[in-house]
């Protein structure tokens, strides 16, 4: 049986409330096609709640899950309409992720940190926009490539019966996988909404 720890375990440290990113988040019917698509780009991975959760588990193993928690908190702030609650959330985000006294401080350059400090004089939904963008790019550039070769991602793929594949997105390997599914008469979306595994022979 494949390793499915990413899906049943919690994020560890949770930000207040349920995080539903502002960007379009895809349906949660877990399938091989969904998990395999996470190789396409970091944007694709982050468009799935399950993708975010598995990536968060990976970051937690590297002691850097504050990055995705900060990003998610900023997304939550963007949706807040009540001005008083918005200011309170902005203050909490600052104390949790920006303050140099916080154990969860994210890594920002001096220019962006100065922008955040200035914005905090009158917090808005976009107070941390520059900081959020910088952390997103950091995760995409630094953590995402390692995630694709991590046990969290490989064993999630293995849970669908895929035990050997080029995690880098090798086109020839992908064509072979598609041809094998066609030979077995397995539709591309067979795993969606179903508990059946896609097995390779």
UniProtKB/Swiss-Prot annotation:
Biased composition annotated in UniProt, kind: Basic and acidic residues: 170-183
Tissue: Expressed in most or all neurons.
Single GO biological process annotation from the record: sensory perception of bitter taste
Keywords: Signal transduction inhibitor
Keyword Ligase on entry: no
Database matches in InterPro entries: RGS, RGS_sf, RGS_subdom1/3, RGS_subdomain_2
Domain of life: Eukaryota
GO molecular function: GTPase activator activity
Domain RGS residues, every copy: 37-156
Membrane-traversing stretches: none
Pfam families in alphabetical order: RGS (PF00615)
Keyword Lipid biosynthesis: no
Disordered: annotated segments: 168-201
PANTHER family associated with the record: REGULATOR OF G PROTEIN SIGNALING, REGULATOR OF G-PROTEIN SIGNALING RGS-1
Role this protein plays: Inhibits G protein signaling in nervous system, interacting preferentially with the G(O) subfamily member goa-1. In vitro, protein acts as a GTPase activator of goa-1. Rgs-1 and rgs-2 redundantly adjust signaling when worms are fed to allow rapid induction of egg-laying behavior.
Protein name: Regulator of G-protein signaling rgs-1
Organism (species): Caenorhabditis elegans
């Amino acid at each position: 049986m494949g390793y499915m720890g990413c899906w049943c375990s919690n994020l560890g440290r949770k930000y207040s409330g349920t995080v539903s990113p502002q960007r379009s988040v895809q349906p949660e019917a877990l399938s091989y096609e969904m998990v395999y698509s996470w190789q396409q780009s970091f944007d694709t991975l982050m468009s799935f709640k399950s993708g975010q959760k598995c990536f968060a588990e990976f970051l937690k193993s590297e002691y850097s899950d504050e990055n995705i928690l900060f990003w998610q908190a900023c997304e939550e702030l963007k949706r807040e309409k009540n001005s008083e609650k918005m200011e309170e959330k902005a203050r909490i985000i600052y104390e949790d992720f920006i303050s140099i006294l916080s154990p969860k401080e994210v890594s920002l350059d001096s220019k962006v940190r100065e922008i955040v400090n200035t914005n905090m004089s009158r917090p808005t939904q976009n107070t941390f926009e520059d900081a959020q963008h910088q952390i997103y790019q950091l995760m995409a550039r630094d953590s995402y490539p390692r995630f694709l070769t991590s046990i969290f991602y490989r064993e999630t793929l293995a849970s669908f019966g895929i035990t050997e594949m080029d995690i880098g997105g090798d086109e020839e390997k992908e064509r072979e996988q598609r041809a094998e599914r066609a030979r077995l008469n397995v539709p591309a979306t067979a795993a969606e909404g179903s508990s059946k595994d896609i097995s390779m022979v």
